[in-house]
């Protein structure tokens, strides 16, 4: 059994021992919220109605049938004003510590993905807003790499936009976004066959048994690869034993591959379809020659190095007088100057290393488990624990709601695994052990 009295230590600084009116037991408050998330109950009000008549709920809370339960508003107020994000994070970590203490946590191979949660906001109530484009977290590191690459090719350093003091500074680059007037923290989500809506995105990491190790909630219009940095940093901080990071094609970017490899770990990523125009020559027919630092086109012509741009892409260009008479020019380029340009990122070598991992036994064995791990976590959360949409508004409230839901799912999985272990020990005490059955139950 899980010792819930540890919650007293986590909330000790929020209560006064020597004065004031006796408060509701914080353990009972957390147990009621865990009941709500375990059974996918839509609200705290409905949870309290069920707890009034449910004997199992009362036994779990430590109440008899004649005792009155806390009012639902007391629980709501406590989680809105008293139990901060740090307290909820501590409860989430404490449950994971219980899982690790029981021997069920295996963070050597982890699985990363994101799922959208519909926000409590009407898509029709929106406004257009101009916001500054956020700088990339790795921009300084990329700029240093670009300058080193340009110097190696004999190119001048790129002129910084704010170097010239005589000219007014360039205004920050702006972008137009759609903002909800009901819940400004949410973002517009539209992907594949999903209906366009305001949503949040839960970027989540789990292990091979489906225990959620880390989660980060962002607006629905934030790309998975953008939120990966925060998730990965916190994951490595709490679980340095991580060795393989498995993700889908949305995470296959030069920076993510470099970040994982430089940390001494291995990315397990799938094949990513090329984003080329339909009917044009496939990308793999343009071969990079590392020795001569050039690109060979399908007609065995050389595309020489031209420059390295601000995005970190090396540009290789063909000779226009050669391309004019090329028999496949219509399928190669539509440039009016008859010049073909092929780009290659300065960190593209990390992508090629990730491709080698994809064909290795460890890459094949880990990626095939995605459907049984992280995808199963999202399916269970939405179908069994009511995470398809959130009744809360604001990034802080939704983050706390998601973490409590994943904490309840981890607790449920821990109870199932402990029951299977108890069942196995009872089975082995009466019957000759079956090795395969024992391995499956454990």
Task: Give the residues covered by each predicted segment.
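Basic, short loop/linker segments at the boundary and entry of helix-turn-helix/winged-helix-like folds
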Residues: 1-34, 39-40, 346, 350
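Anion-binding and metal-coordination hotspots
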Residues: 40-53, 65-442
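Short arginine-rich
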Residues: 58-62
